[in-house]
Every structure is written in structure tokens, then in C-alpha cells.
């Protein structure tokens, strides 16, 4: 186990589980180096089905260098319809080639426009829109270019294979200095951290905003979002955010904040209008943001706490592949593909001493998964040492479960999430480039696996 990069530690990912040195290299040298294909889980009727019963046209789109929201906005503009009539199952990053399903209400197949950087294939019709989460997972093919030590990849694979199986024999020197890349796929495992994208890749602050909101510190939440300069931003943006931190002059901030920072400017406009004299004024300014962004702040705070819980579990040497007394496990989704087990966070059970050996067998056979809380008002924290870890992390960030009883879109009941991410990984070497092929359940991050190989700046 090694200490992670400082940017990763700032969002709760405190360790790499692999002791082997990294390969370095660059991610996303071009969009084609990061390919994502949805593993679809949405049924459709034929394209010529009755439009009254099946008003939603479903199509598969390959997007090249398109962020999902931007494509949906462009599509709705070209169709002359509300953006709310376009739906999809999962949001994908821009600098990639992505293949995913969309649905559009009240549109004929022939109405779909040609849009640069996209290929569209009509699939059929449906009686309801595609909803967020209507997928089994995602298949990835990712190229890391210009690695500094390609040979290290084999040792990382060996370490991650051991972690997936709960093997404690990895040493501080790494698994094997003379390891070779296996032929075909190898089952590997990593902690199921929330990746850097959850918090902001270049400026990871969304969790800071969410933590302040959960504490009821509304002004601090605004300052964390509008102020709080980051060295990776343009100098003019850093100066504008620094001005906010120093002066709390919202009118002056509007003169300095770039037009591209639309949400920050919206907050400042609202504060100029309401006087910014009471905590409720700052809450009102945040509530003026889109509801999905409000939820994102609190979700990022929950994700940060989750990452901290996983890091503490690593620090204490507790297993990830099997439970200890006091853990809460969830069971396999009965609707998941036979060869692609997916955890069902709605079916949980706390592990008692009496049930420990039985649940261990379920985990070994892929029928159950150890979980940790995404803390909200109704989350079960567990007991024993796992419960202690969750409560200690909450105490360290100054929160209690009841703090997530928040107004409107900020409110969250919480849930649970599997702590071990397993996948069958293929690695191919071409000179100094490495190509990684694997599939992950929905909600898990490819970069969380790749960070174990690169071991460096996640934004490089």
C-alpha cells in the first residue's frame, strides 16, 4: 500500500493498494484513446410501434468529444423541443468516444438531425423515457500513452489480482519484480472509490461545498464555490476568486468573474439582490442553482465521506472481499446479467457473528458484497469496527446523520455502496503505450482502476 497523490488524498482517496511502482503516462491524448460503451439494460419495441403507446424514440449515439449534457442541448435545439424531452442513462465525459442510448419524446425517426462528431442509430420505441441508471454498466477501452516504465504494469496486475482475492501476501516491495503481463483477462480488484470526476477534475471543491451545506454553513458553502481559487485555473479566474475570498464584495465579483463561470455569477447576482446579510440569503442564492447541481454538492460530500471510510478500512487492514462482524452486505441484483454481477444496495443485511461464515460464502460466490454507507438521514451505519469507522469519519468532518435532513434538492436519505470493485482486465502493450480493456458496473469509475497503474497526477 502506498500514499496517493495529494490531489487524490484531498478527496479521500488516501492510498494505492498496489505496492508496485507506477507506469506514468498520459490519459486522453485524444478522444479515441478513451472509449466507453454502455452495457445496455433497456427494452424497446419496434420503430413502427404505436406512437401513442410508445411515444419515446430510442436511439444509440456514438459521440466523439461531446459531453452528454452538451449533446442533449444541441439535439433539442436542432429539433426545436424542450431539453427536458431528451433522456439518457448515464452522463459521460467529453474527451472520449462514447456509445450510449438516448430517448426523445414525441419525435419521428426521420426528424433526427445530423450533428457533427456523432453517429446515430435508431433502435426502437418505448413507453417511458430512459432514466438515469437504466444500464448495467460500461465497457472501456483506454490507452495510456508514453508510459515511463511499461514493465511495472505486470507487477500492478499481480498486486490487484491479490487484492481482488483477499490475498494478504503482497509485500512492501510489490508482488514480483519479474512479473509478466498475463495473456487474456485477469480478475483484479481495487477499492470502489468515487473518482476525481465526482469532485471536479481540475478544481475538486464540490465536496467542500456539500460539507458546508450539510453543516448549515451557507455562507461558507458559497465561498467554497465562488471563491476558493485553484492554481490549475487561469490567472484571471484565480484573481477573481481571490477577490471574493478577501472582500465578500458580490457586486465587485460580478465585474471580475469571467462570463464562462455562469453559476458563480448567478449566485453573486442573487446576493446583490437580497443583500447577503443573513445565512438565509446565502441559502437562497444556492437554491437558485439547478436542482441537479444542488444535489451534486451533497452527493459529493457523501462521496468524500465514503472515500474516507474506505481509506480508513485499508489503514486498519480490514478485508474488502469478505465481511467482518458488524459489516452490512448487499446482495446481487437478480436482474443483472449472469456473467456481470451487480450489487443491489436496496437489499442489505448486517453481519452478525452467527451469520459471518454464511455471508462469507455468499461473498466468495459473488452473491453478496461488503458495503459502506453513503451517509444520509436513513443510512444504516453498521456496528463493530466498520460502524466505528463510519462514525469516526463523520465526527472528523463535523457531521451527523441528521445533518442531511436538508431543504429541497439538498436533502438526502443516503444509501450504501459496495466497497470492492472487481473486473476482468486485459492489458496490451505496444512500445510505450498500454491499452486497458475492462467493464464496470454503473456508478463505478474507470479512473479508479487506472490510477493504480499510473500513480501520479490524475489530471496529467
Swiss-Prot record:
- Its name, as the record gives it, is Probable tRNA pseudouridine synthase D
Per the UniProt entry, the Enzyme Commission number(s) are 5.4.99.27
Q: Name one Pfam family in it.
A: TruD
Coiled-coil blocks: none
Task: Name the encoding gene, please.
Answer: truD
Carries keyword tRNA processing? yes
The UniProt entry's sequence similarity note says: Belongs to the pseudouridine synthase TruD family.
The record ties this protein, via PROSITE patterns, to: TRUD, UPF0024
Please state every residue range assigned to the domain named TRUD: 189-421
Q: What does this protein do?
A: Could be responsible for synthesis of pseudouridine from uracil-13 in transfer RNAs.
Amino acid at each position: 500500500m502506498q500514499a496517493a497523490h495529494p490531489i487524490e488524498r484531498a478527496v479521500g482517496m488516501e492510498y494505492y493498494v498496489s505496492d508496485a511502482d507506477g507506469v506514468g503516462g498520459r490519459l486522453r491524448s485524444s478522444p479515441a484513446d478513451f472509449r466507453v460503451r454502455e452495457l445496455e439494460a433497456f427494452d424497446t419495441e419496434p420503430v413502427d410501434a404505436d406512437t401513442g403507446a410508445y411515444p419515446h424514440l430510442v436511439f444509440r449515439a456514438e459521440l466523439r468529444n461531446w459531453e452528454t449534457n452538451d449533446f442533449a442541448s444541441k439535439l433539442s435545439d436542432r429539433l426545436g423541443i424542450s431539453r427536458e424531452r431528451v433522456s439518457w442513462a448515464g452522463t459521460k465525459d467529453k474527451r472520449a468516444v462514447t456509445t450510449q442510448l438516448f430517448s426523445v419524446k414525441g419525435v419521428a425517426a426521420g426528424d433526427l438531425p445530423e450533428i457533427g462528431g456523432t453517429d446515430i442509430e435508431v433502435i426502437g420505441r418505448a413507453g417511458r423515457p430512459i432514466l438515469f441508471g437504466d444500464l448495467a454498466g460500461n465497457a472501456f477501452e483506454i490507452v495510456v500513452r508514453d508510459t515511463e516504465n511499461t514493465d511495472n504494469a505486470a507487477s500492478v496486475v499481480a498486486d490487484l489480482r491479490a487484492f481482488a482475492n483477499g490475498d494478504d501476501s503482497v509485500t512492501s516491495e510489490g508482488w514480483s519484480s519479474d512479473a509478466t503481463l498475463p495473456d487474456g483477462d485477469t480478475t483484479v480488484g481495487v477499492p470502489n472509490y468515487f473518482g476525481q470526476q465526482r469532485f471536479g477534475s481540475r478544481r475538486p471543491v464540490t465536496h467542500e461545498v456539500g460539507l458546508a451545506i450539510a453543516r448549515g454553513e451557507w455562507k461558507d458553502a458559497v465561498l467554497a464555490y465562488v471563491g476558493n481559487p485553484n492554481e490549475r485555473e487561469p490567472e484571471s479566474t484565480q484573481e477573481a476568486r481571490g477577490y471574493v475570498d478577501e472582500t465578500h464584495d458580490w457586486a465587485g465579483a460580478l465585474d471580475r468573474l469571467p462570463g464562462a463561470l455562469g453559476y458563480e455569477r448567478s449566485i453573486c447576482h442573487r446576493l446583490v439582490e437580497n443583500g447577503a446579510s443573513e445565512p438565509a440569503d446565502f441559502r437562497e442564492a444556492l437554491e437558485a442553482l439547478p436542482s441537479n447541481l444542488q444535489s451534486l454538492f451533497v452527493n459529493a460530500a457523501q462521496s468524500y465521506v465514503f472515500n474516507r471510510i474506505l481509506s480508513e478500512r485499508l489503514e486498519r487492514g480490514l478485508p474488502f472481499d469478505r465481511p467482518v462482524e458488524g459489516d452490512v452486505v448487499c446482495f446481487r441484483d437478480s436482474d443483472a446479467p449472469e456473467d456481470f454481477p451487480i450489487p443491489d444496495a436496496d437489499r442489505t443485511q448486517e453481519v452478525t457473528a452467527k451469520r459471518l461464515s454464511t455471508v462469507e460464502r455468499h461473498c466468495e460466490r459473488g452473491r453478496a458484497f461488503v458495503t459502506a454507507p453513503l451517509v444520509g438521514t436513513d443510512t444504516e451505519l453498521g456496528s463493530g469496527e466498520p460502524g466505528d469507522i463510519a462514525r469516526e469519519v463523520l465526527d472528523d468532518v463535523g457531521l451527523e446523520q441528521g445533518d442531511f435532513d436538508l431543504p429541497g434538492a439538498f436533502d438526502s436519505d443516503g444509501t450504501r455502496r459496495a466497497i470492492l470493485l472487481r473486473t476482468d482486465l486485459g492489458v496490451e502493450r505496444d512500445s510505450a503505450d498500454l491499452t486497458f480493456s475492462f467493464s464496470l458496473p454503473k456508478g463505478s469509475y474507470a479512473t479508479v482502476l487506472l490510477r493504480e497503474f499510473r500513480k501520479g497526477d490524475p489530471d496529467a
